[in-house]
Structures are given as C-alpha cells and as structure tokens.
C-alpha cells in the first residue's frame, strides 16, 4: 500500500521519476543518491550497512515495456494478464542507494569488450529509448576504449559476473551498480569523451566496488570518479592536455569549506562541489608529491587489495596506504588539503 515518493529534482532529491518518452510511452526510473534507498525499499539506509551478499530483485510492469534492475537477469515471464516480470540476482555487495528500477520501451545496443589483455569477450549493454537510438549508437562506440583505459589504471571492470550496462534515464544520471543511469545529451567534450558517461562509469570502481563507510569521506567516491576523467585525458591525449583538463576542474574549486567536514555526517551534510573538483585536485597534488610510481601503485592497490575491494573504506585507510607505499608521513598534506 501507499504511494511512492516522487523525486522532485532527480537525482539529487530522491524518489521515483514518472516520465514519458517523446512518443508518449511510460519512462520510469528511481534515484536514491546518498540517503534515500529507504524511500522505496526496506533497508538500514546508511553506507556502512550494505547488503554484503547481494540481493534478489523482482519487477512487474506492463507488457511491451522493458524492466531493468541491478545484477544479472535470471528469469523473465509473461504473466498472461498484460504484465511481465523480470527477476535479477546481484552477486556482489551493493550499497543501498545504488539499487534501482528502470522501465521503458528500451532498445538494446551492444558493443563487445575484450579486456586490457585481450582475453575477455564481454557484452557492453546500452538500453536507450527508441527516439535516441541513433545518437546512442554513435556514443556507445567509445565504451570499449573507456573501459580499457580505466581498467589499466584501476583493474578490470569489477562486476562482469553480473553485467555491464548503462540505461537511458529520464533524469541527469546516477552510478547505479551494473545499470548506470545516463540522461545527458550524447555529446562529447573537446577532449573526446562524454563527461557524464565517463564519470558515472568510473563510479563502478569508486563508489560501487570501493564504498565509504561514513558520508564524511564522500570525497573519495566523487573525487576519484572526477579524477578518472582527467586520467582518461592523460592516457589518451597526453600530459599537456591532462594539465589543461585539470585547469578546467580547478575553476570549479572555491574553497568554501573543508572537503572532509567532520565525522558521522549525512550525505546532505557532506555533499558539495568541493568533493568532486577539489577532491580531484587533492589526488592531482598527491601525484606530484609522491611521484607517479608510488601514486599509481596506491590507486591500483586501493581499488584491488582484498582489504578494500568490495568493502568499506575511509580517508584514514587511504592516508595509511599512501604512507605504506611511499614511505613518507604526510599528515600535513591531508590536514592542509582536506
């Protein structure tokens, strides 16, 4: 019973999005950025208490539409009453705010990904409403290259046992695990990629595989995902263009408040532009402080060591790892920059 909460400003204000495609068909999504999962499903809505053994999700929706959710599709049934049901299994830990539903008359677009060493053959799915299929097909051609570049820095995409998918959403975007929401304009920037698409896909490592236990450390998820955009420029266009991109990010830093504002914060208290753009600049500065060899070793280990991967982390975890790898105590750096 009851009536689902409507998202008044998705994805920043949580709830369901009831929209229509240009032809008038239903186009439905749900967002729960930060605190918000419990707006529509029963959970202890805190990042430190995620379903660490995955979850099962079942959707029932009008026949003729496509119903998508997180994880791997394990069953699809025509109920014979004008509805259909899809069942999904999430095989990894998943944070509460990453659980989602998408319903529309979607068209499936696919590219194949062969891995950073050529040993994989994985489908990369893009589910798009029909009116935008032509634009989506053009944009989606970049996705194998995006995954290869990010994979060389962070390790292979971390959820292939479920799937890799992006879904066209009736709102700007969100890093929903294995079914990333994209609602921008299918337009590349002057560095040759779509900022939103790359940022949200980078969250599959930074936010989904690696999740903060306290929203006070929100900058780890958003700062690393933003810095991933700069690393993509570095690895595809070189150091000079990387510096140009970092200069562009620098324009968004206003030093209005600390990046880490305390402990035991809500996502609303922790959220600001600083966690994105100054967070990325903290990582850029750290790269120059400890050097490329140690810096990229830290990044790789933070994303892949069993003590962090598919688990919960903090700023202190990152600081300790930096000290271990570099052999330097740089408490002054964290105090000054965060």
For each predicted feature, which ranges?
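Active-site rim elements
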Residues: 37-48, 130-138, 215, 266-273, ...
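Soluble non-cytosolic domains of exported or imported proteins
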Residues: 51, 133-144, 188-192, 196, ...
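Juxtacatalytic substrate-recognition/specificity segment
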Residues: 57, 84-87, 105-204, 208-217, ...
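Amphipathic alpha-helical substructures
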Residues: 158, 240-241, 272-338
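The feature captures the short pre-catalytic strand/loop hairpin that immediately precedes
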Residues: 254-269
